[in-house]
Amino acid sequence: VGACRDQSRVYSQAGVALISMLLVLAIVTALCTQMLTKSRLELKRSEALIRTAQTEQMVFSGLAYGQVLVLKYTEKETNPGAARQVNEPSSQKEMGSGFENRSLAHLQIQGGAPLPEPEAGEASSVFVGPYWPFAGNAEEFSILIEDEQGKFNLNNLVNSNGKVNEAQLKVFQRILLALELEPELALYIADWIDYDRNPIAYNSEDFSYLQEVVAYRTANRPIKYWREIISVKGVSQEVLEQLLAYVTAIPGPSKVNVNSASSVLLEAMIPGLDGEALLESRDANGGYSSVSELSKSTLTAGLKMDANLFSVDSAFYAITAYCRFDGFESSWQILSERVEAKKKNKKPQLHTLWKRQLPFWELGLTKMQKIVDLENE
């Protein structure tokens, strides 16, 4: 009997040992699984960070390349016979106005594809190599350069003394009417920028904004980035989309480049003008070499035109780069100012006034996204 009990105890202890081993094995397996899962997640996270960094570096290189192109296309010595025009900001044509006038309206480059072939008489050296080399493996890649002086500068609504500029206010109201928007928006935006707190329209100053659920005040300063007007009363996302191609915010006051301005803007600045006819004439003749040439044109004869508001060159350019690489997207935009060299025999430089990342929800507001969509059709 004693022997049977001893044998039973041995079997019982062996069973406990087996269960303990199985329990330990299960715990080790669970720990290993957890470690492998965590390691796999860390690898994926690291890969995502690397891909994101690669995508952003492609975008940054695109911005730098865009600045190189701006300087090359706006050199005084560039062949003046190579002028090409853009009828409207949204026309998606390839190149802007007269090189001899240092005016660049629009240039769009798609990665991994040959750059545009030079037209007759154009110096081929304006392109840095025949291909954009860094984005050949990108799913989508684009660089967009825009002449910001071909748009209405919102900061022109206010004079240097901080008072509302009535003449520019009327110009902006005519632009709004042409776009079928409420002209009162011009009053609200002007009140947002002017330095005082005296309303020029109903509920256009601090008192109205302080009644909002999230209270805030008017800026009472020049606009740095045009999308700031989303905070202005009456300005919605839809309004922003309509204004996108026609307004900008650059240090003011600034002049409008007649060689890159749209027909809407020109008609607003010269009441009674046939903007489409002027653009056709401008394109056919390779742009205007001087403002006086425009003022002496038969298209402006008998019309009230303030020549001091116009120019035939530009200093401010917005450069946007967009890249989608291996499923990751990135888009950045910079505003560059072309500054002439103070010393002789020195080339002009581009100064970056601001640099900002475009969030994905805002990409739909940029022409960059519209160009990408057009390329995919």
Locate the predicted segments by residue:
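N-terminal leader/signal peptides at the extreme start of proteins
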Residues: V1-A14
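Compositionally biased linear targeting/interaction segments
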Residues: V16-E377
